[in-house]
Amino acid sequence: MVLVLRVQEACSQEKRLIKSGKFKDVQRANIKLAVNLMLTNYALLDNVNQASTLARGRSQEALNVGVGAVEALQQVLDYFDSSSKSLKVDTISSEKQEFVVKALDVAAQRIDSFLTYLPAAQVDKAKALIAYENDLNLKEYAEQNKGEKYLNPTPGA
């Protein structure tokens, strides 16, 4: 469940990055790479499948909603040409940007819906763990980068 929530967080961060154009390194500017990492590194489909088993009596419904988040992100990879330069933050057309931002929004919303099928106590526990990890990361960053702020903080920050 934590990894599913991390994808939701990554969707928000990527959306802000696209809209602001602020990124620290070249890799972060590649939208297709970021979306691919959300799907593969966080094993979104596998984790949605696994977490849906917690939706007592509504596992299939939960799975269908969660798969919708996967499909929204997959569209970003499938819809555009295979060129690694087709979706760069600094060169993206307004039409492509609108499509990608909508897909990221849909994925985040479907994850929200997916989470409503799961036990609230477990969702809250996973969110608390993420908040704790993010706080540790922020403190570590502040210690190592005196005076610098995060370019793309966690949602709500």
Where are the predicted features?
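C-terminal amphipathic alpha-helix
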Residues: 2-14, 75-157
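Alpha-helical segments in soluble extracytoplasmic regions
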Residues: 2-79
